[in-house]
From Swiss-Prot:
Highest classification ranks of the organism: Bacteria, Bacillati, Bacillota, Bacilli, Lactobacillales
Cofactor dependency: Mg(2+)
The protein's assembly and partners: Homohexamer.
UniProt source species: Streptococcus pyogenes serotype M1
EC number: 2.7.11.-, 2.7.4.-
Keyword field contains Nucleotidyltransferase: no
UniProt entry keywords in alphabetical sequence: ATP-binding, Carbohydrate metabolism, Kinase, Magnesium, Metal-binding, Multifunctional enzyme, Nucleotide-binding, Serine/threonine-protein kinase, Transferase
Important for the catalytic mechanism of dephosphorylation as annotated region, ranges: 264-269
Protein's name in the database: HPr kinase/phosphorylase
Family statement: Belongs to the HPrK/P family.
Described function: Catalyzes the ATP- as well as the pyrophosphate-dependent phosphorylation of a specific serine residue in HPr, a phosphocarrier protein of the phosphoenolpyruvate-dependent sugar phosphotransferase system (PTS). HprK/P also catalyzes the pyrophosphate-producing, inorganic phosphate-dependent dephosphorylation (phosphorolysis) of seryl-phosphorylated HPr (P-Ser-HPr).
Active site: 138, 159, 177, 243
First-tier enzyme category under EC: transferase
CDD domains on file: HprK_C
Residue numbers spanned by region Important for the catalytic mechanism of both phosphorylation and dephosphorylation: 201-210
C-alpha cells in the first residue's frame, strides 16, 4: 500500500505549516521515525534521511539555544530530498530557520498539538499498519464476541451463508471472499477487506448484499485482529475429527501462526452456533479455562479411583 504525506496528515490530524501539493503527495517508505539528537551537533554518520523527522520539546529546546546561523546550517544539512516530512509536536513555536530550510529543500513541515510520545505512537501505529506487506486469502473474516475469526473452506461449502447467519446473531462482518491479512508485529495478525468488497456479502441464489445497509453500522467492522481460523469441510463417514479439542493445529499467515479448528459440515448442523462456541471456548482457553483439561483430569481421577478400589 502506498502511503503519502497527505494521508498521514489526514489520519493523524496534523497541521500543515508549509507544503505544496507535490510535497504532500510524496511517498513515505518506512514506518521508522527519527528524533534528531547527534545530528543537531553536526554529526550525520548513519543519519537516515528517508525517515520522518520528529521534533519534540528536547529537540526544540536545543535548537532555541543555538545561534540563528548554526540553527539554519544544521537544519539545512538535516533536511534532505529523501525526507518525506518534518513534524513538530506540542504546538511549539517553529523557528523561521526551520521554515526557510524546509522551503529551500522541498520538505513538508507539519505540526501537532499532542505530546511527542503520543504523536510518535499514533504515527507509528498508522504507518506500521499501512506499510505492512499484505497477503490475500480466501474466506470470511468475522468479529465474534470481540474475537477475529477467519472462516475458510472449499468453494460452495457455505462460508458466506454462515457469515450472514452470524451477522443475524449480532456479530460483525469484516470481510467476505477476499481477506487481506498482514502482520503488525511478529505475533499479531490483522485482516481487512478489499476496498471494492467492503461491507458486501455474496450469497448464492440471492446475489451481493450490502450488510451495512440491511443490518446497520453495528453489523460491520473495517478491520480486526485475526486470532482464530475455522476450516469448514464436508463430513465424511469414517473420517476422524477432533472430538476432545486437544488438537494443536496451527496455520501461518504473513509469518504469524494462529490456531485452526476443523469443523465438519453436514445437513442439519447449525454451523454458526458451533463457530460461536469455538470462539468462546478459544477465549476461555486464553483465560486459563480449559474444558478438555478438566475432562482429562476428571477421567484420570476416575481411573485412579477405580484402580484403588479393585
Amino acid at each position: 500500500m502506498t502511503v503519502t504525506v497527505k494521508m498521514l496528515v489526514q489520519k493523524v490530524k496534523l497541521d500543515v505549516v508549509y507544503a505544496t501539493d507535490n510535497l504532500l503527495s510524496k511517498e513515505i517508505t518506512t514506518s521508522d521515525i527519527s528524533r534528531p539528537g547527534l545530528e543537531m551537533t553536526g554529526y550525520f554518520d548513519y543519519y537516515a534521511p528517508e525517515r520522518l523527522q520528529l521534533f519534540g520539546m528536547k529537540e526544540w529546546s536545543y535548537l532555541t539555544q543555538m545561534t540563528s546561523h548554526n540553527r539554519y546550517s544544521v537544519l539545512k544539512e538535516m533536511f534532505k530530498k529523501d525526507t518525506p516530512a518534518v513534524v513538530v509536536s506540542r504546538n511549539l513555536a517553529i523557528p523561521k530557520e526551520m521554515v526557510q530550510a524546509a522551503k529551500e529543500e522541498g520538505i513538508s513541515l507539519l505540526s501537532s498539538r499532542v505530546s511527542t510520545s503520543r504523536l510518535a505512537g499514533e504515527m507509528s501505529y498508522f504507518l506500521d499498519a499501512s506499510l505492512a506487506e499484505r497477503t490475500s486469502v480466501h474466506g470470511v473474516l468475522m468479529d465474534i464476541y470481540g474475537m477475529g475469526v477467519l472462516i475458510q473452506g472449499d468453494s460452495g461449502i457455505g462460508k458466506s451463508e454462515t457469515g450472514l447467519e452470524l451477522v443475524k446473531r449480532g456479530h460483525r462482518l469484516v470481510a467476505d471472499d477476499r481477506v487481506d491479512v498482514y502482520a503488525k508485529d511478529e505475533e499479531t495478525l490483522w485482516g481487512e477487506p478489499a476496498e471494492i468488497l467492503r461491507h458486501l456479502l455474496e450469497i448464492r441464489g440471492v446475489g451481493i448484499i450490502d450488510v451495512m445497509s440491511l443490518y446497520g453500522a453495528s453489523a460491520v467492522k473495517d478491520s480486526s485482529q485475526v486470532q482464530l481460523a475455522i476450516y469448514l469441510e464436508n463430513f465424511e463417514a469414517g473420517k476422524v475429527f477432533d472430538r476432545l479439542g486437544n488438537g494443536n493445529e496451527e496455520i501461518t499467515f504473513s509469518g504469524v501462526r494462529i490456531p485452526r479448528i476443523r469443523i465438519p459440515v453436514k445437513t442439519g448442523r447449525n454451523v454458526s452456533v458451533v463457530i460461536e462456541a469455538a470462539a468462546m471456548n478459544h477465549r476461555a482457553k486464553e483465560m486459563g479455562f480449559d474444558a478438555t483439561k478438566t475432562f482429562e483430569d476428571r477421567l484420570t481421577q476416575l481411573i485412579t479411583k477405580n484402580e484403588v478400589s479393585q
